[in-house]
Amino acid sequence: MRTTLVIMAAGIGSRFGGGIKQLAPVGLNGEIIMDYSIHDAIEAGFNKIVFIIRKDIKDAFKEAIGDRIEKICNNLDVEIAYAYQELSELPEGVELPTGRTKPWGTGHAVLACKEVLHEPFAVINADDYYGKEAFVKLHDFLVCYTPEKANQFCMAGFILKNTLSENGAVTRGICETNEEGYLTAVHETSNIVKTPEGAAVDNDEQLTSINAESYASMNMWGLTPEFMQTLEDGFKEFFANMGDKDILKAEYLLPIYIDELLQAGKVSVKVLDTNDKWFGVTYKEDKDYVVKSFAKLIEDGVYQKNLFEDLK
């Protein structure tokens, strides 16, 4: 069965000193974080990659990774496709609000793929390193898809303490699960910081401790082709319910929408636990740590010095 990896790479990179953080080189040979995610996905069995980008970064993106990955994937019988997240791509009858410059969010990003997604797929962020285990587990879940399982999703569940930055606050989906390992709620939580005790939410310099051992969503979801129509319907509802005060800032976020479907009893989400340590370039200061982390993974034999050599 064909399975697709969707990579959300349209982010502006506002926290990374003005640069396009998804394209920052971190590997021995100039690889970026996406290279490692693509390698791990192909190794796990995914055979199609969809890049979600903006048209205004298309040339920089193709120069940094797109053209190179296309050549590698051609030799591995892995399909490459592009989708473009644009502010003006809105439901029929909806006009772009005057003054709106902020992207519509991760739900809108995935919706940009509707013309190129016809199979079970995983969604990831471009600037997060997830580790190999999660890709294997998501792939093995997705290949069991049948149309009767259209509303059965999955999610990679990371341990919160393994997903924090040393250099500032992060946003994570804090998850609740039942005894069978299914997601019961996901709470999008901002301003999570690392503390000597574990983790806390920083609200105007007042710290509120949270459980560092809880599951966190890193926007790594396993979804079905039928979800695309559901996602489009949800985007229309998002506009119908959006007040004038939210028109310039409101976002259609994937974890929040999936949680709404969960609470309505419309879907199930199996949490696939992973003990791999996340890292990523949320802040410019994170880059040195990420570079050293990849060098250590290569030294330990997790990756080859020439990254894709072992897939040939």
Predicted segments — roles?
Residues 132-221, 225:
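Conserved core of the sugar-phosphate nucleotidyltransferase
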Residues 91-103, 168-173, 285-289:
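Short, surface-exposed amphipathic charged segments that create phosphate/polyanion-binding patches used
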Residues 232-267:
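A C-terminal functional module that forms or caps the active site or interfaces directly
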Residues 13, 129-131:
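A short, conserved beta-strand element in the Rossmann-like catalytic core
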Residues 70-119:
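Short phosphate-binding loop-to-helix
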Residues 2-70, 85, 119:
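N-terminal glycine-rich phosphate-binding loop and ensuing alpha1 helix
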Residues 263, 278-280, 284-312:
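Hydrophobic helical membrane-anchoring modules
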Residues 119-129:
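Short beta-strand-to-loop acidic/aromatic patch adjacent to the donor-nucleotide binding site
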